[in-house]
């Protein structure tokens, strides 16, 4: 049986810092970001199913979110303003991401490739699944801004404003629910979020 370097590569996602051009009170890496996006995407899918007559596989969406930035272990994390500077750059970067996704799949033993291709390759996801993961990704970036601003880091002021516009564009009932019920807590201290539920 041949060795595979797939999971050794994925373990290096923790070495890739997000927000590399900005001063951070606390550095965030791609691995922890991916887990948070999985938490939020799963929640959005559950909210849609329970509150807004959705019919999504919330567990699959959590997995898609968990792997949504996996290709960055080969490409690195390109800052959003550069990645989307114009349509041509965005298009070319998408092609690079696609190649990286395929390279990751090819690292796996052949008998596992199709299972992971379904998670790594965007062409195997529905428009609705992609939309939920994109909403969660934008929400998590927004939450990072709130945390940095709460810690006194004004560096994230413009990023927060930009992400508010992005969230408006990706608006959905489930996102509104999440924003109303869960987001306000991210601006509170540990003592404030622990008051109602002491151990």
Swiss-Prot record:
Its cofactor is a divalent metal cation. Homodimer. GO terms for cellular component: cytoplasm. The keyword Kinase does not apply. A divalent metal cation binds at residues 33, 68-69, 137. Residues 30-142 form the HD domain. Belongs to the 5DNU family. Its EC number is 3.1.3.89. It catalyses: a 2'-deoxyribonucleoside 5'-phosphate + H2O = a 2'-deoxyribonucleoside + phosphate. Catalyzes the strictly specific dephosphorylation of 2'-deoxyribonucleoside 5'-monophosphates. It is an enzyme of class 3 (hydrolase). InterPro entries: HD/PDEase_dom, HD_domain, YfbR, YfbR/HDDC2. This is 5'-deoxynucleotidase PC1_2775. It comes from Pectobacterium carotovorum subsp. carotovorum (strain PC1). The record marks 18 as: Appears to be important in orienting the phosphate for catalysis. GO terms for molecular function: 5'-deoxynucleotidase activity; metal ion binding; nucleotide binding. Keywords: Cytoplasm, Hydrolase, Metal-binding, Nucleotide-binding. It is found in: Cytoplasm. Substrate binds at residues 18-19, 33, 69, 77-80, 137.
């Amino acid at each position: 049986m041949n060795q595979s370097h797939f999971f050794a590569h994925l373990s290096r996602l923790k070495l890739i810092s997000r927000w590399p051009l900005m001063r951070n009170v606390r550095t965030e890496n791609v691995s922890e970001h991916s887990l948070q996006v999985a938490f939020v995407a799963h929640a959005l899918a559950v909210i849609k199913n329970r509150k807004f007559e959705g019919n999504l596989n919330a567990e699959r969406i959590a997995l898609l979110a968990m792997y949504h930035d996996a290709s960055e272990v080969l490409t690195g994390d390109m800052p959003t303003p550069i990645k989307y500077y114009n349509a041509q750059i965005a298009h070319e970067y998408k092609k690079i991401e696609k190649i990286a996704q395929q390279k990751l799949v090819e690292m796996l033993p052949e008998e596992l490739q199709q299972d992971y291709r379904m998670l790594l390759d965007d062409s195997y996801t529905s428009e609705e699944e992609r939309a939920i993961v994109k909403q969660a990704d934008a929400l998590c970036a927004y939450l990072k801004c709130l945390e940095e601003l709460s810690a006194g880091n004004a560096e994230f002021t413009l990023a927060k404003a930009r992400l508010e516009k992005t969230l408006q564009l990706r608006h959905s009932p489930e996102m509104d629910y999440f924003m109303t019920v869960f987001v306000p807590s991210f601006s509170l201290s540990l003592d404030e979020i622990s008051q109602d539920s002491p151990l």
